Amino acid sequence: MDNKDEYLLNFKGYNFQKTLVKMEVVENIENYEIRDDDIFIVTYPKSGTIWTQQILSLIYFEGHRNRTENIETIDRAPFFEYNIHKLDYAKMPSPRIFSSHIPYYLVPKGLKDKKAKILYMYRNPKDVLISYFHFSNLMLIFQNPDTVESFMQTFLDGDVVGSLWFDHIRGWYEHRHDFNIMFMSFEDMKKDFRSSVLKICSFLEKELSEEDVDAVVRQATFQKMKADPRANYEHIIKDELGTRNEMGSFLRKGVVGAWKHYLTVDQSERFDKIFHRNMKNIPLKFIWDINEE
């Protein structure tokens, strides 16, 4: 793909979205002052970030659970490197929740004190690939891919926002002992959502009543989120970032195994070979179909 410099800003080997980030912010990320009770949602793009923002917003904010406060999830758990709404992060009340796509080596040094918590959400990369393909076709701030085949090559070359998927997840996993981090699988959460919410609450040391857990589970389903203007990003993508067509949405399907409808057998097998070569020493569990055990 041509003109990638129009969309990507590369800093220390990592691709940021060029129009949403300022170089002075990027250069000072590692020196940003972290609070002991900060929480970071870390993901590779298209891996369940918005879902996790909604889950943590529901866990932490009673006004979000009982719908008495009309605050968007992007303002409750803003993107650390992409301050789209120009919030003053230093004045945010504790505990602060941040979302981020950055790799382990660019995060604030204070996260290595192991007091602030990191929730790393990961998703099977074939579904990430297909979700990213559709998202790039929708959003004006991303290069518009021609075909799944051409985008698959771009994705596997790491010439996308977020850089190479393998480097991102492997880097975080191999350096997990440097941080207070928990890895969560998008697919596991889909299979047993309530248990996953309880696991997240335990990691965050956040006690909720059974009734509150029920409220989190009920409101963080994909269908409920899609209908919730606080969480569906519709206003943000259409009015603030811009789309190529009116039909698309930020929250598209959120299903497991959608890749089967888009990748040919040959593409899938080529992807598998690259996956196994890169991930053979990473014991994280991956689910490629929702019917898998």
UniProtKB/Swiss-Prot annotation:
It comes from the Eukaryota. Its EC number is 2.8.2.3. Gene3D superfamilies: P-loop containing nucleotide triphosphate hydrolases. 3'-phosphoadenylyl sulfate binds at residues 46-51, 123, 131, 220-225, 252-254. The keyword Cytoplasm applies. GO terms for biological process: sulfation. This is Amine sulfotransferase.
